[in-house]
């Protein structure tokens, strides 16, 4: 906390005025540091902040984990309209820390996920990787993470032209040495998909393309079946035909005992790729492709998540609407979801459904 306080005092122009410290260290309670009083973290903390007209709370690197775990204190701070800033994780060990305002994602009470980087790297390095839905929130993060492992080539497929163009620009800027083909097409075009598989002969397929908005698919069930089911069947069949080593399909927890069209469509996809895997293992179908499925729930920041809707409702002054007050939601960050997809792709031997631990309910 001292280092952070020195930094804000030395900032030119000064962005923050140091009014005090909050600490759970009883030995320094009521002392003064750098001319500012040290307050205890207790039931009176919020009143002290209100009396001193505090508008901003800076969280030091050493206090971030405890702060994330203290849901009651977070709620009280936010209820007072106090803005929260903390250093970005990349800068915790540097002398000059860049502060950013805290988002909902930063408050998720969870340690960073670590994966077997060596195994993932050996699987992806020097290989041809095909990613569907590459311009989506999950797909685009998959592109960024996979590109770090120096694949021989990325074949990126999405039907959204402008976001796909953004991916092309991102690849050219951040990964200029990685060969990338950005293709605009629908996975439902069998002839186009066949041409792509025949031309590029991918080693691995990460299938992230899907319609995922539950209410939209309830009103458009034919599109859900066409895109999610038929599109997946086309890709899976071609993966077998053209010798793909591993096909990793991204599914959803809504496929478990599905109660809506979208969940049903994804469950059908799971069953189909598992049946293909079994047929290959039993010698009914000639092929070598291993099919692995990954399931997870709400992803913070995803285009299909409720979080963007909640943010808009909060900014508009409310109310925040939920489908049912009894609903319990679990959330995961996009980067950690994608890391787990890569981990599952590495560890899966075919036929498995990997269900991600979504942590504590929010």
Give residue ranges: language-model regions:
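Conserved S-adenosyl-L-methionine
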Residues: 13-15, 147-153
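Proline-aspartate-enriched helix->loop->beta-strand connector
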Residues: 49, 53-55, 151-152, 197-206, ...
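A solvent-exposed beta-alpha-beta segment
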Residues: 1-85, 159-166, 173, 180-181, ...
């Amino acid at each position: 906390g001292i280092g952070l306080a020195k930094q804000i005092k030395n900032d030119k122009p000064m962005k923050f005025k140091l009014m005090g410290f909050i600490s759970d260290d009883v030995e320094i309670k009521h002392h003064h540091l750098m001319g500012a009083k040290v307050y205890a973290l207790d039931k009176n903390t919020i009143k002290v902040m209100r009396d001193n007209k505090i508008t901003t709370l800076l969280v030091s690197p050493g206090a971030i984990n405890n702060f994330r775990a203290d849901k009651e204190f977070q709620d009280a701070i936010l209820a007072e309209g106090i803005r929260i800033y903390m250093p970005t994780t990349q800068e915790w060990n540097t002398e000059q820390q860049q502060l950013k305002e805290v988002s909902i994602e930063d408050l998720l009470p969870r340690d960073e996920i670590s994966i077997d980087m060596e195994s993932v790297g050996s699987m992806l390095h020097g290989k041809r990787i095909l990613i569907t839905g590459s311009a989506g929130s999950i797909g685009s993060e998959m592109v960024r993470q996979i590109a770090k492992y120096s694949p021989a080539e990325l074949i990126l497929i999405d039907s959204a032209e402008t976001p796909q163009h953004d991916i092309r620009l991102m690849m050219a800027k951040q990964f200029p040495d990685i060969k990338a083909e950005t293709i605009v097409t629908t996975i439902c075009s069998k002839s186009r998909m066949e041409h792509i598989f025949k031309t590029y002969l991918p080693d691995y397929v990460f299938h992230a393309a899907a319609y995922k908005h539950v209410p939209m698919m309830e009103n458009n069930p034919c599109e859900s079946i066409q895109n999610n089911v038929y599109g997946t069947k086309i890709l899976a069949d071609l993966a077998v035909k053209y010798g793909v080593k591993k096909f990793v399909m991204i599914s959803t927890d809504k496929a478990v005992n599905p109660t809506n069209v979208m969940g049903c469509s994804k469950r059908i996809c799971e069953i189909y790729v598992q049946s293909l895997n079994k047929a290959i293992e039993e010698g009914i179908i000639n092929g070598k492709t291993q099919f692995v499925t990954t399931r997870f729930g709400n992803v913070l920041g995803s285009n299909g998540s409720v979080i963007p809707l909640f943010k808009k409702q909060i900014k508009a002054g409310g109310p925040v609407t939920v489908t049912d007050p009894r609903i319990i939601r679990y959330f995961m960050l996009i980067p950690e979801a994608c890391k787990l997809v890569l981990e599952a792709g590495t560890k899966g031997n075919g036929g498995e459904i990997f269900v991600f631990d979504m942590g504590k309910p929010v």
